[in-house]
Swiss-Prot record:
Chief location: membrane
Gene3D superfamilies: 3.40.50.2300, Periplasmic binding protein-like II
Organism: Homo sapiens
Record-given protein name: Glutamate receptor ionotropic, kainate 4
Entry's transmembrane regions: 546-566, 624-644, 805-825
Length: 956
């Protein structure tokens, strides 16, 4: 049999085919809302009747008549009495009531016995235990469909924890599909029933304490509004809660003056606002409301009125199609007889085939008389009213408009003031020096303050900084509660936690985190043992005092041995005048006691000496000493570089394993921080041993703040376990601190938010934008670089300062002073022991100083001699020099009036020059020598040989 499809605007000619009453088609409507200022059901039925009767397509003169009966209360007796009044009128269908479940059940039973169609417009009750009559059709969406739609929304939002508030116990049966989904999954659904007082406040407090963010409310419109009012009083209507209403009159609730704009309130609607008659229908109800109920603003057409409107059209459409196949008629029925309507079954079959578009969307029924193939619109409350963000279709399931939902979330941050909980921690958040003179956010500075300014500029929100009360980041207590900033986020007392808050799995279970804005790890901070301060004589440090003493003894021993060996060996004795060719009886030894002491010094200083060893024995002593000094000097140079160019750090531990394997150095971390949680939950053996030590150590090795830990490191034998970022910050400002080993783990800092925060994605995108623009790195350099200590990565050799090698300058200055003093003593000693004194000692010293200052010629005649030289014998006439004499060195001596020195030199040269071809000055004895031919005993010819021919004094 083909499906029946008819538009509402077409009225066929079936109205003329009514047997018993050819001029009317009678329908009965039972209303349980007699008040004019209520749902407008009476008006909606009248509008449907008038619209059908005025349709130009209607053929014939038959018209639709709707008899309205009122129920004063939900009573089975009164309902049965009303039905007994309806049956004799010969109706083709009974509509309603909309809110009387007991009466609706009696009507269904009576209509089923008489085979008269019955249209329900109220939510179904006791679906599992109530027998559905064949003659009963329900235009209201089933609770099963609503249950599946709610489950789809929870899946879309990845909600794993929710709470269901039930106004009646039947809701557990009505929402069976929803409950079954939570039973087969690991998600948690808590159910709370309203008590007889109908006060939802205790239930809401329990939900708040349980930290449940998603609340499903299954109640009528009035109770749903009451629950929302109480939630607002408890501060539970905020951006961290999501409310889902199962009542289909969600769009009729007034919430603009009730809730925060950021709250996520979702509900369903079945109204088809695109229908051609919907605007006229709503305006008519609004006009009637204004005339009779002007004390309360009109919120919109009630669902029951729209369903009754569609029910009238569904009955008319089915009767039209039935009249095309057979002539039907109606006749009066009685409650006292067993007579039934003979065309009732046929009409029911045609009603199940009806397909039309009504005020509540697509109207179609399945074999059970339930509505099918329709869609529920999913609405979300915004500051501008309700907006559709998706729909749930019976056949197609859930389809959400992610773009609309995301854009709405972004709008929630605009011009919104967020409460930021934080903690005083350098350099993340610090009080300004003049914070007493300021108020609000201006009192603070630091990395987090600058980052908040950047985020607020991108996302266009306002914020208020508030310090956490207990001054900790957050750890779980034995009773399951959390302390610190994490606890404030869980209690919804703050919107953001911006600090050095580490992202951990344990915290992620109770709060949400943004993407990390900084990456770090746990490190070890320890004090640097610099040893004693380098002194002026630190150049002596490469050798121990014992080595220096043995070197001095070795020097004295070598000097004595050299002096002794040089005296014993005959090869160190030689003539001071080699020109005498053996005629001189005087022998000289160059290794006097002074020279023996000086020779090792020259070798030790690697400067050499004018004294050259002649004998094999002295050369042996010299070679051994030079080998000794080579090793000593090389070792000294190597150690000097290590001692003076690099300040060695005396650190007794080099890794975390060294720290765990000893007990002399105490170590700990911040109490209640992520580092403490890391060691507490670690399964690594070394970290477990460290946790056992820290947990059992008395007095406690845990500190309350980073500043306390730094002070403990500097003032005691203590190693502090903290994040690498803080380690770097304090090492930049105190050169006595150093990092031991590498990182123990890898983690990140993130912005904390309450679970289910609707703007987490927006903060994620903003943080990524700051990272791409390098703004976070710029802020880190701004607040981390202290500039007091050099970078540890710079391993270039450090230049030596006066504090390192100043002692050698002291030794040099002292040596120069001693040398000057000794020179003066020698000068005075010579003057005092000279036999002839021409001037005083002071005058002589002044003269010498003047010649030194004026840089005069260093060659001058001796002013003082130890003894008066004897007079020279007169030179014979034949040996007197000629007027001009030429020396072999090219110097000329004039014949006329020469000075005495030149005349004497010329005379001596003339004596030597007799019988010689050349003369010269001996380079050793500084006396004149002549080149004279002498017969050689080995050869017959003559040989030339230099021979000293005079005993004259050496030239000056």
């Amino acid at each position: 049999m083909p499906r029946v499809s008819a538009p509402l605007v077409l009225l066929p000619a079936w109205l003329v085919m009514v047997a018993c009453s050819p001029h009317s088609l009678r329908i009965a409507a039972i209303l349980d809302d007699p008040m004019e200022c209520s749902r407008g059901e009476r008006l909606s039925i009248t509008l449907a009747k008038n619209r059908i009767n005025r349709a130009p397509e209607r053929l014939g003169k038959a018209k639709v008549e709707v008899d309205i009966f009122e129920l004063l209360r939900d009573s089975e007796y009164e309902t049965a009495e009303t039905m007994c009044q309806i049956l004799p009128k010969g109706v083709v269908a009974v509509l309603g009531p909309s809110s009387s479940p007991a009466s609706s059940s009696i009507i269904s039973n009576i209509c089923g016995e008489k085979e008269v169609p019955h249209f329900k417009v109220a939510p179904e009750e006791f679906v599992k235990f109530q027998f559905q009559r064949f003659t009963t059709l329900n235009l209201h969406p089933s609770n099963t469909d609503i249950s599946v739609a709610v489950a789809g929304i929870l899946n879309f939002f990845n909600c794993t924890t929710a709470c269901l508030i039930c106004a009646k116990a039947e809701c557990l049966l009505n929402l069976e599909k929803l409950l079954r989904q939570f039973l087969i999954s690991k998600d948690t659904l808590s159910v709370r029933m309203l008590d007889d007082t109908r006060d939802p406040t205790p239930l809401l407090k329990e939900i708040r304490d349980d930290k449940t963010a998603t609340i499903i409310i299954h109640a009528n419109a009035s109770m749903s509004h009451t629950i929302l009012l109480k939630a607002a009083e408890l501060g539970m209507v905020s951006a961290y809660y999501t409310y889902i209403f199962t009542n289909l009159e969600f769009s009729l609730q007034r919430m603009d003056s009730l809730v925060d704009d950021r709250v996520n309130i979702l509900g369903f609607s079945i109204f088809n606002q695109s229908h051609a008659f919907f605007q006229e229908f709503a305006q008519s109800l609004n006009q009637s409301w204004q005339e009779n109920c002007d004390h309360v603003p009109f919120t919109g057409p009630a669902l029951s009125s729209a369903l009754l409107f569609d029910a009238v059209y569904a009955v008319v459409t089915a009767v039209q199609e039935l009249n095309r196949s057979q002539e039907i008629g109606v006749k009066p029925l009685s409650c006292g007889s067993a007579q039934i309507w003979q065309h009732g079954t046929s009409l029911m079959n045609y009603l199940r085939m009806v397909e039309l578009e009504g005020l509540t969307g697509h109207i179609e029924f399945n074999s059970k008389g339930q509505r099918s193939n329709y869609a529920l619109k999913i609405l979300q409350f915004t500051r501008n009213g309700f907006r559709q963000i998706g729909q749930w279709h019976v056949a197609e399931g859930l389809s959400m408009d992610s773009h609309l939902y995301a854009s709405n979330i972004s709008d929630t941050l605009f011009n919104t003031t967020l409460v930021v909980t934080t903690i005083l921690e350098n350099p993340y958040l610090m009080l300004k020096g003049n914070h007493q003179e300021m108020e609000g956010n201006d009192r603070y500075e630091g990395f987090c303050v600058d980052m908040l300014k950047e985020l607020a500029e991108i996302l266009r929100f306002n914020y208020k900084i508030r310090l956490v009360g207990d001054g900790v980041y957050g750890v779980p207590e034995a009773n399951g509660t959390w302390t610190g900033m994490v606890g404030e986020l869980i209690a919804r007392k703050a919107d953001l936690a911006v600090a050095g808050l580490t992202i951990t799995a344990e915290r992620e279970k109770v709060i949400d985190f943004s993407k990390p804005f900084m990456t770090l790890g746990i490190s070890i901070l320890y004090r640097v043992h610099m040893g004693r301060k380098p002194g002026y004589f630190s150049f002596l440090d490469p050798f121990s005092p014992g080595v220096w003493l043995f070197m001095l003894l070795a020097y004295l021993a070598v000097s004595c041995v050299l002096f002794l060996v040089a005296r014993l060996t005959p090869y160190e004795w030689y003539s001071p005048h080699p020109c005498a060719q053996g005629r001189c009886n005087l022998l000289v030894n160059q290794y006097s006691l002074g020279n023996s002491l000086w020779f090792p010094v020259g070798g030790f200083m690697q400067q050499g000496s004018t004294i050259a060893p002649r004998a094999l024995s002295t050369r042996c002593v010299s070679g051994v000493w030079w080998a000794f000094t080579l090793i000593i000097i090389s070792s000294y140079t190597a150690n000097l570089a290590a001692f003076l160019t690099v300040q060695r750090m005396d650190v007794p531990i080099e890794s975390v394993d060294d720290l765990a394997d000893q007990t002399a150095i105490e170590y700990g971390t911040i109490h209640g921080g992520s580092s403490m949680t890391f060691f507490q939950n670690s399964r690594y053996q070394t970290y477990q041993r460290m946790w056992n030590y820290m947990y059992s150590k008395q007095p406690s090795v845990f500190v309350k703040s980073t500043e306390e830990g730094i002070a403990r490191v500097l003032n005691s034998n203590y190693a502090f376990l903290l994040e690498s970022t803080m380690n770097e910050y304090y090492r930049q400002r105190n050169c006595n601190l150093t990092q031991i080993g590498g990182l123990l783990d890898t983690k990140g800092y993130g912005i904390g938010m309450p679970v289910g925060s609707v703007f987490r994605d927006e903060f994620d995108l903003a943080i990524l934008q700051l990272q791409e623009n390098n703004r976070l790195e710029i802020l880190k350099r701004k607040w981390w670089e202290g500039g007091k200590c050099p970078k540890e990565e710079d391993h270039r050799a450090k230049g030596l300062g006066m504090e390192n090698i100043g002692g050698i300058f002291v030794v040099l200055i002292c040596g120069l002073i001693v040398a000057i003093f000794m020179a003066m003593l020698e000068f005075l000693w010579t003057l005092r022991h000279s036999e002839a004194t021409e001037v005083s000692v002071c005058q002589e010293m002044v003269t010498e100083l003047r010649s030194i200052i004026l840089c005069q010629d260093s060659i001058h005649p001796r002013r003082r001699r130890a003894a008066v030289p004897p007079p020279r014998p007169p030179i014979p006439e034949e040996r007197r020099p000629r007027g001009t004499a030429t020396l072999s060195n090219g110097k000329l001596c004039g014949a006329g009036e020469p000075d005495q020195l030149a005349q004497r030199l010329a005379q001596e040269a003339a004596l030597v020059a007799r019988g010689c071809t050349h003369i010269r000055v001996c380079p050793e004895c500084r006396r004149f020598q002549g080149l004279r031919a002498r017969p050689s005993p080995a050869r017959s010819e003559e040989s030339l040989e230099w021979e000293k021919t005079t005993n004259s004094s050496e030239p000056e």
